[in-house]
Swiss-Prot record:
Residues 237-246, 509-520 have a biased composition (Polar residues). This is Pleckstrin homology domain-containing family H member 1. The modification Phosphoserine is found at S745. Pfam families: FERM_M (PF00373), MyTH4 (PF00784), PH (PF00169), RA_2 (PF21989). Residues 997-1333 form the FERM domain. Keywords: Coiled coil, Phosphoprotein, Repeat. The gene is PLEKHH1. The lineage of its organism: Eukaryota, Metazoa, Chordata, Craniata, Vertebrata. SUPFAM superfamilies: PH domain-like, Second domain of FERM. Residues 578-672, 687-796 form the PH domain.
Length: 1364
């Protein structure tokens, strides 16, 4: 550039030109520097690559050398191995040749097999064609025979008609009264006998016998149509029942057991009515007449004794209860037979009718006999060997031979047949469902040795059951609804109209037939909607609300009723509500606990009731003065309510929910109180932040009220016991501040009765937006600070200016949205302190609670600073339980202990065991309860800051995070942690397990299964996990439930409801045991025992049973048999014991001489004795001599040996098949004594509760006295110290009346509660099955009924001083 010579004109600006060139020079230098840098980088990269290339070259040279050496070595080896390779080659060639030869041989064999199979298939096809041809010919022949029999039957029908005309010509009036109902009247259950029957003469009797024999003899035993059978049935029955021998007595008798043995047990054979004649000559004349009438007629009828029979078509066993009912309705005209019994006949002897028992027992028995279990579906049980053959006459055998000779023997169909030993067990079971007769001596000794059925609860009752209350349930809309959680007392809900009840408590209620004949049934009363039962003098008892749809003839729709409910326009109360009302209500009677329909009138502060509206001019049957001491309590599900006066309690309900609400609203307005109901916390279960007595002042009016701050709403109540508030005040965005006075003068307070607050009271004002201010007068400064702080936080104001210093720091952190870099996290107030506290960290409403907070901190310090050792772990268990129990008793301290533990875990010096034990105590707190609002936010933030999977403290923080989230989802606990829970946290690392605790669950067969759970697991979650692991269905299908044993060691079990926490149940059990055994050491060796047993049994769920369910059901049934609560005779007891022995111990090993290969006789004898003790009824062995016991063991050995090779599932199937033949299989039996009998008589009965109803069984024979279906049960539960059952019988068709019966039984209190809850569960399950509810309010689930009885005396709020 220096060489360039630029000739520029004089006008060029050289200065600018110089600057431009300097700028370009600067740019060139920058580019040059960049180029140098890039060049240097490139050179360095190339140098690096050069070094790497040189390194790779050296490595390659090294590898080349190595490979050359390997090649040299391999060449040497190849030279040596050429000979061995040649030998291997030759060996492989030989092996290939051998394989080829084997393949050729197999191919040849395959071809031969193919040819053989083709020939066999051809042969089978030929045989099938022959069989088909034979079947076709046989069917044609049978069809021809059927036509012949039909024509023959038609002739016989004509003969029957002529003979009937002849019989009618013989005027035998007395005997006509005993005629069997015709085919059209099959719905009648029985025909009562007439007392005025005149005996007939001998000649006329003989003539009638001959005529009847002529009618009955020619009945063929072939398959007939329904029409032909029905045509022949009615005249046959008329003629067969028109003759009564001289001196005979006709009476109604229940069905005998032998009827069930003449056909398979699962058929409804008990519906066949059998008439017997007591004269021996009757049968002889009948057989002679038969032989004389049709000498050449072939018949397939088999006779089962004297008399003749009808041939009936084959029918299927009813598969549903409806089929059973239909068969039961037509049993008079068309008896049924079992599967495959075409030629089996039914005797119609003339001795007595088998009348149906009024209790419904035959229906149960027929249902049990007709029920087929899934294990033997589509199978047929053969009759017992030697049973039916003995009853068959030679003529019947000849008839069978003639039937077989009709053609060639057909091929045997491939039907399932039981093995011999299985058939033997079923044969024994047909007659074995009863108790064997025992000698008086052994029976007396057995009864004396058995524990008494009615025992007093003893000392255990005073400790655990001291607050147990047996509830009372009633049937409302088909569901069991609790109307009282206390037993009924005779004087409760009493009234003047109850005094007219009869002593026997049997009251008549007219039915619709009697109403129509009543003179009071005017059309005007009908149009008014007034029930005729309420107008008549006999209408004391109303239709229960579950069946409360009044007859259409006597009621109108609700919007048309004019007299069932009416208001008065006089005397309007608050808000315009009428304080006078009249209408119909259903009232529970005092003696017979059933619903009575009464006309109630509310007037002038009194409520009176009459029998009908027309009786209002008379003296009322009862009246209640409504004053301030009266109380209204809603019942379960808001279907009933209680009116509690000073003297009595009235249980009331209405015809509809709307009428019920109207009455409650009017009564509330009159009493100026809200109806209390079941305890229900507001806002979805949120507990109050702060509560206490305050004086509320608004518009110059003051009132002392009980106040509670729940969430963002301020509630105030009349008293602390009320569940419904007088009013509420929204606090969100309200202005909260402290003022000097809320009124102008002290005289206002004096007039309001608040003189004690004048000198020292503090005042807060709540001024919501768009509302007038409300003033709160508070007695002490501590209370004022507490209310001010919590109201300010609820209002959404800044909490950094109210509360303690600790709370203000938390408020500042919340205002900063929890900034992790904020220096406030390391503030000394929030961090670890070696010294003790001088004041509480949170605002507490009283000095006593502040003192308790300081003591709580000292307890925590002792727990943290003393090292945990396994030998002395009970010291830390006691400290943790005591500290947490104080927090449960005083919820105000729950946030305090969280703040104390958070303070001691933050910025703590690395002293391992102290920090770990602090986190352990926090891990015990998290499942129990949670802090309030902003404290909960602070705890979550701290846990998030400390969570770290790499350190042990970080893993504890993660565990606490999970525990806090679980507590938020499932709710808080009720009891302090148990010893098992504390020890598991202290000695095991809970963060290593998702379920840190585990406990064994015991089954009825002696096994157990260990199940894991956490601190928030409920019983439902626990059972869901258990069912998944052992292969069972959910409890609503299987009927199983979880039970605990009794802390006292007595033979009592407690069912756990589904919402109970497992840890709470264990803790309450431990507390109860400590109260029972106060002298024992803290770490007792005995722990709670959980049992999984069947509680409810549903026949509709049998098809889905799993193998584990069947095993447990069989084991539980075996225990019932051993305890004497299952009726089986001695022979069947041995069969059942042998089956259970095969399940439990497998095949029986025969005793041999002592040696390595056999079982010693002593060991075998011990095994047999063990089987007898576990599976054989005690009553059959008690007091028996040694020789008899040896004989029993020998018989058991014989029966057990026949089960050789039978698998346990097969034995269980047979066991349950036999056990289910008893109609009350799965029912729960309770020993009770009827209260009508004196205690000296000691006549015990069994109360059997199952899904069909409640049955009363004889205590000795276990035979049914009577059965009450749930549809007839009106009220049940506790009555004083006894069990009460109120029954409404089905109206009698003849008289049109039903009866109300009140039954009282003496039982122990736990058994009364268990029976009551099981009945309620069955009733509600049946209702849910028929009509699934749409989640009615207040409806309890199936498994939540009996949880109220569990350890009620050990509540969380016990033994703690009131520090407020």
């Amino acid at each position: 550039m220096a060489e360039l010579k630029v000739e520029a004109p004089a006008s060029v600006d050289w200065q600018k030109r110089c600057l431009t060139l300097e700028t370009q020079l600067f740019r060139f230098r920058l580019q040059a520097s960049k180029i140098r840098e890039l060049l240097a980088d490139k050179m360095q990269e190339l140098e690096q690559r050069l070094l790497e290339a040189e390194q790779r070259a050296e490595n390659a040279e090294t590898q080349v050398g190595v490979m050359e050496e390997k090649v040299k070595l391999s060449n040497l080896k190849n030279v040596d191995s050429e000979g061995s390779l040649h030998r291997k080659y030759q060996e492989l060639l030989k092996a290939i040749k051998g394989k080829d030869e084997l393949i050729s041989q197999l191919e040849a064999q395959l071809e031969k097999q193919k040819q053989m199979r083709a020939e066999e298939a051809k042969t089978v096809q030929e045989k099938a064609a022959k069989i088909k041809e034979w079947v076709t010919l046989k069917l044609a022949k049978l069809e021809m025979e059927n036509q012949h029999l039909k024509s023959h039957n038609q002739r016989l029908v004509e003969q029957v008609g002529s003979l009937q005309d002849a019989l009618e010509a013989i005027q035998i009036a007395p005997s006509r009264k005993l005629l069997v109902p015709p085919y059209g009247a099959a719905e009648q259950d029985s025909v009562p006998s007439e007392p005025g029957i005149q005996p007939m003469g001998q000649d006329s009797g003989s003539q009638a016998q001959g005529l009847k024999a002529a009618v009955l003899a020619p009945s063929p035993g072939a398959l007939q149509s329904k029409d032909s059978v029905s045509e022949a049935a009615s005249p046959l029955e008329d003629s067969s029942s028109s003759t009564v021998h001289s001196g005979e007595t006709v009476e109604a008798k229940p069905l005998q057991p032998h009827l069930g043995r003449e056909s398979p047990p699962h058929q409804p054979c008990m519906k066949l009515l059998t008439f017997r004649c007591s004269s021996a000559s009757w049968g002889e004349g009948l057989v002679t007449a038969q032989r004389g009438m049709l000498p050449g007629t072939k018949t397939s009828a088999r006779e089962g004794g004297p008399g003749s029979s009808l041939t009936l078509p084959k029918v299927r066993a009813p598969g549903t209860p409806r089929d059973s009912i239909q068969l039961a309705k037509r049993h008079h005209s068309q008896p049924q037979v079992g599967h495959g019994h075409f030629g089996r006949v039914v005797n119609i002897e003339t001795e007595a009718f088998s009348a149906l028992h009024p209790s419904g027992l035959p229906e149960l028995e027929s249902r049990a006999r007709s029920r087929e279990e899934p294990e033997k579906m589509e199978m047929e049980e053969p009759p017992p060997a030697g049973k039916n053959e003995e009853r068959e006459s030679p003529k019947a055998l000849g008839a069978e031979l003639e039937e077989v000779e009709l053609g060639n023997k057909p091929p045997t169909p491939p039907l399932h047949q039981f093995s011999s030993w299985e058939s033997r067990i079923y044969a024994v079971a047909t007659s074995g469902m009863r108790l064997s007769d025992m000698s008086p001596r052994s029976n007396t000794a057995c009864c004396a040795s058995s524990p008494p059925a009615l025992v007093s609860p003893g000392s255990f009752s005073g400790l655990v059951y001291k607050n147990v209350t047996v509830p009372v349930y009633t049937a409302l809309k088909g569901r069991a609804t609790q109307i009282s959680n206390m037993p009924f007392m005779d004087e409760s809900s009493g009234s003047d109209d109850d005094c007219s009840s009869q002593a026997s408590f049997r009251i008549s209620v007219p039915s619709s037939e009697s109403r129509k004949t009543s003179g009071l049934g005017s059309p005007r009363a009908i149009k008014r909607g007034v029930s005729m039962s309420s107008l008549s003098s006999e209408g004391d008892y109303a239709i229960p609300p579950d069946a409360c749809s009044l007859d259409s003839d006597y009621s109108e729709p609700e919007h048309k009723l004019q007299r069932t409910s009416s208001y008065s326009t006089d005397g309007l109360g608050l808000g315009g509500e009428s304080l006078e009302k009249s209408g119909y209500l259903l009232k529970m009677g005092s003696q017979v606990k059933t619903w009575k329909r009464r006309w109630f009138v509310l007037r002038q502060g009194q409520i009176m009731y009459y029998k009908s509206p027309s009786d209002v001019i008379r003296k009322p049957q009862g009246q209640v003065d409504l004053n301030s001491r009266c109380q209204i309590v809603r019942g379960e599900g808001s279907q009933t309510f209680q009116l509690i006066s000073e003297k009595k309690t009235y249980y009331l309900t209405a015809d509809s929910p709307s009428l019920l609400e109207e009455w409650i609203r009017v009564l509330q307005s009159l009493l100026k109180v809200q109806a209390t109901g079941p305890p229900a916390l507001l806002r979805g279960g949120t507990k109050p932040t702060v509560k206490g007595w305050l004086t509320k002042v608004k518009h110059g009016h003051s009132k002392v009220v009980w106040c509670a701050l729940v969430g963002k709403i301020f509630y105030y109540y009349r008293s602390h016991e009320d569940k419904r508030p007088l009013g509420c005040l929204p606090v969100r965005d309200a202005h909260i501040e402290e003022v000097d006075r809320s009124c102008d003068s002290d005289e206002d307070y004096e007039a309001g009765g608040t003189r004690r607050l004048l000198s020292s009271h503090c005042t807060l004002v709540i001024h919501p937006t768009e509302h007038s201010p409300t003033y709160l007068l508070i007695g002490t400064k501590h209370e004022k600070d507490t209310w001010l702080y919590h109201l300010t936080v609820a209002a959404g104001g800044s909490s950094a200016k109210v509360g303690t210093a600790y709370e203000q720091l938390i408020g500042k952190l919340m205002d900063g949205e929890g900034d992790p870099d904020s220096p406030l996290w390391r503030h000394p107030m929030l961090c670890y302190s070696k010294d003790g506290l001088y004041a509480s960290l949170t605002t507490l409403p009283s000095e006593a609670l502040q003192t308790e907070a300081l003591k709580l901190f000292k307890s925590c310090q002792l727990f943290i600073n003393v090292p945990v050792e396994a030998a002395s772990v009970d010291y830390h268990v006691s400290l943790a339980q005591t500290a947490l129990q104080v927090c449960l008793v005083h919820p105000e301290l729950q946030s305090e202990i969280y703040c104390q533990l958070m303070k001691q875990t933050s910025c703590r010096p690395p002293q391992k065991y102290s920090l770990m034990q602090c986190w352990q105590l926090l891990a015990l707190c998290a499942p129990l309860f949670l802090p309030q609002h902003h404290f909960l936010w602070y705890v979550k933030q701290q846990l998030q800051r400390h969570a770290d999977p790499r350190s042990e403290t970080g893993q504890y923080a993660t565990y606490c995070q999970r525990a806090v989230e679980r507590t938020l989802r499932t709710g808080e606990r009720e009891a302090r942690p148990s010893r098992m829970e504390v020890v598991s946290i202290l000695l095991r690392n809970p963060f290593h397990h998702s379920l840190p605790f585990s406990i064994p669950v015991h089954f009825t067969n002696g096994t157990y299964h260990v199940v894991g759970f956490d601190g928030s697991s409920t019983v439902d979650e626990f059972l869901q996990r258990l069912n998944q692991e052992i292969g069972m269905r959910k409890p609503s299908h299987s009927g199983f439930a979880l039970f605990t044993d009794d802390p006292s060691g007595r033979d009592l079990e407690h069912c756990l409801q589904g919402s109970v926490k497992i840890c709470d149940a264990i803790s309450k059990w431990e507390q109860a045991m400590k109260e029972l055994h106060p002298g024992k050491s803290e770490g007792g060796t005995r722990v709670v025992k959980l049992m999984y047993k069947n509680r409810l049994y549903f026949r509709s769920q049998v098809k889905g049973e799993t193998d584990r369910e069947r095993l447990l059901l069989a084991s539980q049934t075996s225990r019932e048999i051993v305890a004497g609560r299952f009726p089986i005779n001695k022979e069947l007891a041995l069969e059942m014991a042998a089956l259970m022995a095969q399940v439990e111990y497998g095949d029986l090993e025969k005793p041999a001489l002592p040696g390595p290969g056999g079982t010693s006789p002593a060991k075998a004898q011990h095994l047999l004795q063990q089987v007898l003790d576990r599976f054989h009824p005690r009553r059959y062995r008690h007091g028996a001599p040694a020789e008899q016991l040896r004989h029993l063991a020998d018989m058991l050995t014989t029966k057990w040996a026949t089960l050789q090779g039978c698998s346990p599932p097969e034995c269980i199937r047979i066991y349950l098949t036999v056990a289910r033949k008893w109609p009350f299989f799965g029912a729960k039996l309770f020993a009770a004594q009827p209260a009508q009998l004196s205690s000296k008589e000691n006549a015990l009965v069994w109360i059997a509760v199952n899904e069909d109803g409640v049955s009363i069984l004889d205590h000795n024979t276990m035979q049914v006295h009577i059965t009450y279906p749930y549809s007839s049960v009106t009220t049940f539960g506790g009555c004083r110290d006894d069990f009460m059952l109120v029954i409404r019988s089905i109206p009698d068709k003849s008289s049109g009346k039903s009866h109300i019966e009140k039954l009282i039984f003496r039982m122990a209190a736990p058994k009364i509660a268990e029976a009551t809850f099981i009945m309620a569960s069955y009733m509600n399950h049946c209702t849910t099955t028929v009509n699934p509810p749409t989640n009615p309010p207040g409806a309890c689930q199936l498994w939540e009924l009996d949880g109220r009885q569990f350890f009620s005396s050990v509540s969380c709020a016990t033994k703690g001083p009131t520090l407020l």
